[in-house]
Design a protein with these regions (language model features):
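Active-site-proximal alpha-helical scaffold in enzymes
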Residues: 92-123, 170, 176-205, 262-270, ...
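Conserved catalytic cysteine-centered active-site region
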Residues: 29, 61-117, 149-152, 163-167, ...
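Beta-strand segments within the central parallel beta-sheet cores of soluble alpha/beta enzyme folds
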Residues: 51-60, 87-92, 117-121, 187-192, ...
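Active-site pocket-shaping loop/turn-to-helix segments
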Residues: 17-43, 63-66, 89-106, 115, ...
Length: 343
């Protein structure tokens, strides 16, 4: 989608909760309440904007099997106390669900279908339920299989090729093999990520965007490891391969998390109604598919397509933010962009 030639779309504000770890501070907080919290925060921080002017609320939600209640965006609208006339819709593009929400809201604004929208994402991996498939007949004999909806495949179609249904961690191992990414390189990259996050917190760079959840004693991200050392990371054993060939560990993988984030998006008219200066303008977006066993390399082609739509090149970008599901996955993507400064 290239939207620059249609209507300009502005990011007016951005908020998020602190990110809680699996079973951590947000263990007792429902995902619809997390989503409502960031929606309400955006409204409260923009007092000049009449909430009735919000044309849509779009949220990404990759799990959505439990308290998300089918359409967590609409639940957030109602729980946040917005007018009942404000609609809400939930989208799912797995790890990219929150970004997909931003794309869809921006597209609506660019095409004139909306002037003001809220777009975000929410997950509670802690509270994602266990599920059991309904039997095909009454009173079946034997036992029923149960799946966790926190992460990974469930109720896999037997027609799906086995190499496509591997775990995310095994996919990271395949990427490490493909590019010869060592365990040491992954650990160094992960350690640097934690250092950057800790330094950003210390410098107050997150203070304006983070909105703590009332009643929960959490004001900073729970999973940032301050003071980690190469020696500590080296002691951890590989999680997904135990045959001596594994390189992916808990330390160089993303943790399981709970949290929510949201953006306030507008066109020119909506921007004027907020009385605010924009943080950014959305120029272009793109999505792409890839062999499922190499899912983490999807950003490479998507970034190239988005840059082409925007008429830009990597050299035009001042800051480049890349999803880091696994250090191996991020390093695999960076193989395509050797000119980037990894700092």
């Amino acid at each position: 989608m290239s939207i620059r030639t249609v209507r300009d779309v502005y990011v007016v504000d951005a908020v998020r909760t602190p990110i809680g770890k699996f079973g951590g501070a947000f263990a007792k907080v429902r995902p619809d309440d997390l989503a409502a919290h960031v929606v309400r925060a955006l409204v409260d921080r923009t007092p000049d904007l009449d909430p009735a002017r919000i044309d849509d609320v779009v949220f990404g939600d990759a799990n959505g099997a439990g308290e998300d209640n089918r359409d967590v965006a609409r639940m957030a609208v109602l729980l946040a106390g917005l007018p009942v006339t404000v609609p809400g819709v939930t989208v799912n593009r797995l790890c990219g669900s929150g970004l997909e929400a931003v794309i869809q809201a921006a597209r609506a604004i660019a095409l004139g279908d909306a002037s003001v929208a809220i777009a975000g994402g929410v997950e509670s991996m802690t509270r994602a339920p266990w599920v059991v498939q309904k039997p095909e007949r009454a009173f079946p004999a034997g036992h029923q299989e149960m799946w966790s909806t926190t992460l990974g495949w469930r109720m896999t179609n037997p027609r799906m090729p086995a190499e496509w249904t591997i775990s995310l961690g095994e996919s990271a191992e395949l990427i490490a093999e493909k590019y010869g990414i060592s365990r040491e390189a992954q650990d160094r990259f992960a350690l640097e990520s934690h250092r950057k996050a800790a330094d950003a917190w210390a410098a107050g760079l997150y203070d304006k965007e983070v909105v703590p959840y009332q009643g929960v004693d959490l004001v900073r991200d729970e999973c940032v490891r301050e003071g980690s050392t190469p020696e500590a990371l080296a002691r951890l054993k590989p999680v997904f391969r135990t045959d001596g060939t594994g390189t992916v560990t808990a330390a160089n993988s993303t943790p399981l998390n709970d949290g929510a984030a949201a953006l306030l998006l507008t066109d020119e008219e909506g921007l004027a109604a907020t009385g605010r200066e924009p943080l950014a303008r959305i120029s272009a977006s793109a999505v792409t598919g890839i062999e499922p066993q190499f899912f983490g390399l999807g950003p490479v082609e998507a970034v190239q397509n988005a840059l082409a739509k925007a008429g830009r090149s990597l050299g035009d970008l001042g800051v480049f933010e890349l999803n880091e599901a696994f250090a191996a996955q991020a390093l695999g993507c960076l193989e395509a962009w050797p000119e980037l400064d990894r700092a």
